[in-house]
Amino acid sequence: MANIRKSHPLLKIINQSLIDLPAPSNISTWWNFGSLLGICLGLQILTGLFLAMHYTSDTLTAFSSVTHICRDVNYGWIIRYIHANGASMFFICLFLHVGRGIYYGSYNYLETWNIGIILLFAVMATAFMGYVLPWGQMSFWGATVITNLLSAIPYVGTSLVEWIWGGFSVDKATLTRFFAFHFILPFIITALVIVHLLFLHETGSNNPTGLNSNADKIPFHPYYTIKDILGFIIMFLFLMILVLFTPDMLGDPDNYTPANPLNTPPHIKPEWYFLFAYAILRSIPNKLGGVLALILSILILILMPLLHTSAQRSLMFRPIGQCLFWILVGDLFILTWIGGQPVEHPFIIIGQLASIMYFLIILVLMPLAGILENKIMKL
């Protein structure tokens, strides 16, 4: 009689995805981030569920309900801070996961890559709406500024913004619908994650060399389950250090002031994980141009497979491509820093140069490096 995990209709799927899955023998720690993202998502849904039990999505009580969670609910403070800082861990893992995909040419698995981009947009939308919920100053003004960007759309822009707001400004209707969407989106994300994995398991995982690894596969369990558990422990260690020692390090002090539509904070900025895109948005003086650049800064990932000119899949044996990749990483750090700075000299020009570099590296220099490396290989 066959083992139950191999014969049971439901356990069979889990077995083929997590236990007997043939995995390349040489995948490095960079392949840990997929499972870490799964853990982050589960953690966010769990902590979010407990927060939703005590939160009220009303402009009059939202701020005080968050205070109530921190002061009066049993371990409410730690649930709230795990949720808030868990989002930061989520984005750290997300950026490293996407970076790994770019470095090792994983974007050549088209379906997996495109679902991943949809997931990135969905997670960003969820995080943005979650930031609005505590109804502090930065929540309110962040929501006002970001939703207002849609008014740059010709002809229908203003109507679209008022439709999203549910009125003529960010108010009770906006907060209520943002809470509803913030609650439902993680479950949609979970469904998309399953599709993401489904497409990945059609082709099997990529590996650092970018070569076909069918001749050398090992079972996922116990090798990579143990490796993933080590990753979980390290991530939880970092998360708990953040939560227990400096829970407000990544937040904004302005969010401890209740939302006031009559008082604008001196520097409106989103959470740190959106700052690179925010810097690109601000570097273009035209409103519509800025919005398009903001969207393109993420949508550019769709073009990755089309811009791949190299005969090799991975950057592992491509020194010129590697240099450009790490310059791009440095450029993203500069953009993140600029996004948090006031709009004044010299930050404006630095942001504009960094934005030009971002698009130049991805659209022009990386494809040219691929062509050049192909020619060097033939010498």
Curated annotation (Swiss-Prot):
The chain crosses the membrane at residues 33-53, 77-98, 113-133, 178-198, 226-246, 288-308, 320-340, 347-367. InterPro entries: Cyt_b/b6_C, Cyt_b/b6_C_sf, Cyt_b/b6_N, Cytb/b6-like_sf, Cytochrome_b, Cytochrome_b_C_euk/bac, Cytochrome_b_N_euk/bac, Di-haem_cyt_TM. The keyword Metal-binding applies. It comes from the Eukaryota. One of its GO terms (cellular component) is mitochondrial inner membrane. A ubiquinone binds at residue 201. It is a multi-pass membrane protein. SUPFAM superfamilies: a domain/subunit of cytochrome bc1 complex (Ubiquinol-cytochrome c reductase), Transmembrane di-heme cytochromes. Its main location: mitochondrion. Heme b b566 binds at residues 97, 196. Heme 1 (or BL or b562) is low-potential and absorbs at about 562 nm, and heme 2 (or BH or b566) is high-potential and absorbs at about 566 nm. The cytochrome bc1 complex contains 11 subunits: 3 respiratory subunits (MT-CYB, CYC1 and UQCRFS1), 2 core proteins (UQCRC1 and UQCRC2) and 6 low-molecular weight proteins (UQCRH/QCR6, UQCRB/QCR7, UQCRQ/QCR8, UQCR10/QCR9, UQCR11/QCR10 and a cleavage product of UQCRFS1). This cytochrome bc1 complex then forms a dimer. This is Cytochrome b. The gene is MT-CYB.
